[in-house]
């Protein structure tokens, strides 16, 4: 994951110091892109240990269409707890928009089901898109989507994905987001009978929080290790039927975890 370390170093050394919504303060750049060949290994950061369980369960939770943290908590995942209300609700966040986007005439659009059907029927389409950025629903969301929009692309029998992330917490959030959408690309490829291609990560406001600088220096001093390979142990009937136990990262090794506070 040299690309990720280069990205972090670039923002740390050349970013602009800015205020932010949380009051923490950031150093940021506007606009950055990284490309990962998924055939060369699964793009998971190795210069610190990631909680892979949280990444996998969160993606499965999105695909369920859920917006309540209780299911995550039942599986030992607490990454959304800071934003949930007393009943565990987050408002119409990712899962709701992916699976049940409301229309003016009272219907709901399942973007994920439609996406799978489109990839199978018309792989050359330039409309293989899912958006979580629903302007009408944003006031009711506890946290508006950071990873807001993604598009798939098929060429030479390979499925690639590009994510646009409008707000990118480089130290804590981006490693999760890269791994999550790389995993989704593998799942989509399996479901549509394609091989994996590239995952392209594109960021808007790309920032390091001021209270992460010490951790950033620690991570930049570490040498990245070889990337693992993702193994999907079975092919479920649909994109919605995967389980946590279906995934294995063969050869995953990492440096020790680096703790850092979350800006809420």
Curated annotation (Swiss-Prot):
(6R)-5,10-methylene-5,6,7,8-tetrahydrofolate binds at residues 51, 169, 263. PANTHER family: THYMIDYLATE SYNTHASE, THYMIDYLATE SYNTHASE 1. Keywords: Cytoplasm, Methyltransferase, Nucleotide biosynthesis, Transferase. Its main location: cytoplasm. Its EC number is 2.1.1.45. One of its GO terms (biological process) is dTMP biosynthetic process. It comes from Cupriavidus necator (strain ATCC 17699 / DSM 428 / KCTC 22496 / NCIMB 10442 / H16 / Stanier 337) (Ralstonia eutropha). It is an enzyme of class 2 (transferase). This is Thymidylate synthase.
């Amino acid at each position: 994951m040299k690309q990720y370390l280069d990205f972090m170093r670039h923002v740390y050394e050349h970013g602009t110091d800015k205020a932010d919504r949380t009051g923490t303060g950031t150093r940021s750049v506007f606009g950055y892109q990284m490309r990962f060949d998924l055939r060369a290994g699964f793009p998971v950061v190795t210069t610190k240990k990631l909680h892979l369980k949280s990444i996998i369960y969160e993606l499965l939770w999105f695909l369920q269409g859920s917006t309540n943290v209780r299911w995550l908590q039942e599986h030992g995942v607490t990454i959304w707890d800071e934003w949930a209300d007393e009943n565990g609700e987050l408002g119409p966040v990712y899962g709701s928009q992916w699976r049940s986007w409301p229309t003016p005439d009272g219907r709901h659009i399942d973007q994920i089901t439609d996406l799978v059907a489109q990839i199978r029927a018309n792989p050359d389409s330039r409309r293989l898109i899912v958006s979580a950025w629903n302007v009408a629903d944003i006031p009711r969301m506890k946290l508006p989507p950071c990873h807001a929009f993604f598009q798939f692309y098929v060429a030479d029998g390979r499925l690639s994905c590009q994510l646009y992330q409008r707000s990118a917490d480089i130290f804590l959030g981006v490693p999760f987001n890269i791994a999550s959408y790389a995993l989704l690309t593998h799942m989509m490829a399996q479901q549509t009978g394609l091989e994996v291609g590239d995952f392209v990560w594109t960021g808007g406001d790309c920032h390091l929080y001021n209270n992460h600088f010490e951790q950033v220096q620690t991570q930049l001093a570490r040498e990245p290790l070889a990337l693992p390979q993702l193994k999907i142990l079975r092919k479920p009937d649909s994109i919605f039927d995967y389980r946590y136990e279906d995934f294995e990262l063969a050869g995953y090794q990492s440096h020790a975890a680096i703790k850092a506070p979350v800006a809420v």
